[in-house]
From Swiss-Prot:
This is Pectate trisaccharide-lyase. Belongs to the polysaccharide lyase 1 family. It catalyses: eliminative cleavage of unsaturated trigalacturonate as the major product from the reducing end of polygalacturonic acid/pectate. It comes from Thermotoga sp. (strain RQ2). GO terms for cellular component: extracellular region. The active site is at R222. The gene is pelA. GO terms for biological process: cell wall organization; polysaccharide catabolic process. It holds the Pfam family Pectate_lyase_4.
Length: 365
């Protein structure tokens, strides 16, 4: 009976994947980008809680019990978890947090502090927008916040309109990949680097981050904004329109920004501004920006790695050395660019929560 039930579940899983265009996923999947880079303490790069106990959670209390437990865990968010009151919880090292059954975290955020080796996949985050604090000055809630942590992979998650950051990377965090995520109606999407006053030598060795195949829809700024470190931004789709249903900033301002000597390479991305009418009126989206009391470096891909810009302002760039990328990502990891003309369809179809089906979890449930 047990075998028959498992076979039936797997067949249902495959059939559902075919109908919905879902992607088969595994707990053994590896990230692309800086999260894959091996170090002495993590020779295989980011593997999360692989090999640890698999637990299914359905309440905020159950989720926090395992995110704050010592040791390896694969934590499966089954359905919707609502935090009341709204709050953030801590995530310790060696955790994989994945969602099934349209997993949502409502009114809750994850703080990865003084930790390493964390994976978060296939979860929809919402409910952190506070009407009395549209600029995030009072509550400072982030959906995901990494502080003094390394080797983190955030994949196939959706983030909807929070007060402060959707994914913020601070306090010298390092070796992080944000991939195949969807950001909707958010203002300050993703900040890398805590402040201009961080130690430049220490910060310059940290903050290695990859963003690839993400969908930024009607967001305002920081997609991402990087201080000090290195960021590789490739094959993302920026679809900029009016941010509706919220107070605060309404029109998108800029996409990728580099400050405080950061080295940022941007390639194979598709930037779509507000449209012809707005562009003709002089209101246009700035796809890349150089910022800060100390300017950063930012370069654009060439040839097959070119970006595409529609109804945008002229992108701002600043090379470290003329004719060369700000840094060469291939020196750190292997990756393959999708053709830029294919990016909108690939990313819209594939990014965000609810797109992954974990076959290796079916027999564990």
């Amino acid at each position: 009976m047990r075998f028959s039930r498992v076979v039936s579940l797997v067949l249902l899983l495959v059939f559902t994947a075919v109908l919905t265009g879902a992607v088969k996923a595994s707990l053994n999947d590896k990230p692309v980008g800086f999260a894959s880079v091996p170090t002495a303490d993590l020779p295989e790069g980011t593997v999360g809680g692989l090999g640890g106990e698999i637990v299914f959670v359905r309440t905020a209390e159950e989720l926090e019990k395992y995110t704050t437990a010592e040791g390896k865990y694969v934590i499966v968010v089954d359905g919707t978890i609502v935090f009341e009151p709204k709050r953030e919880i801590k995530v310790l090292s060696d955790k994989t947090i994945v969602g099934i059954n349209d997993a949502k975290i409502v009114g809750g955020g994850l703080v990865i502090k003084d930790a390493q080796n964390v994976i978060i996949r296939n979860i929809h985050f919402e409910g952190f927008y506070m009407e009395d604090d549209p600029q995030g000055k009072k509550y400072d809630f982030d959906y995901i916040n990494a502080e003094n942590s390394h080797h983190i992979w955030i994949d196939h998650c959706t983030f909807v309109n929070g007060n402060d950051g959707a994914v913020d990377i601070k306090k010298y965090s390092n070796y992080i990949t944000v991939s195949w995520c969807k950001f909707v109606d958010h203002d300050k999407v993703s900040l890398v680097g805590s402040s201009d006053k961080e130690d430049p030598e220490q910060a310059g060795q940290a903050y290695k981050v990859t963003y690839h195949h993400n969908y930024f829809k009607n967001c305002i700024q920081r997609m991402p904004r990087i201080r000090f470190g290195m960021a590789h931004v490739f094959n993302n789709f920026y679809s900029m329109g009016l941010r509706t249903g919220v107070s605060g900033n309404v029109f998108p301002i800029y996409g990728v920004a580099s400050a405080m000597g950061a080295k940022v390479h941007v390639e194979g991305n598709y930037f779509m501004g507000y449209g012809a009418v707005m562009a003709e009126a002089g209101i246009a989206f700035l796809p890349t920006r150089i910022m800060g009391p100390v300017e950063g470096y930012l370069t654009l891909g060439e040839g097959d790695a070119k970006n595409k810009f529609y109804y945008c302002k002229e992108p701002e760039t600043r090379p470290v050395e003329e004719g060369k990328p700000a840094f060469d990502p291939h020196e750190y990891y292997d990756y393959t660019l999708d053709p830029v003309d294919d990016v909108p369809k690939i990313v819209v179809d594939g990014a965000g929560a609810g797109k992954l089906v974990f076959e290796d979890l079916m027999s564990s449930k």
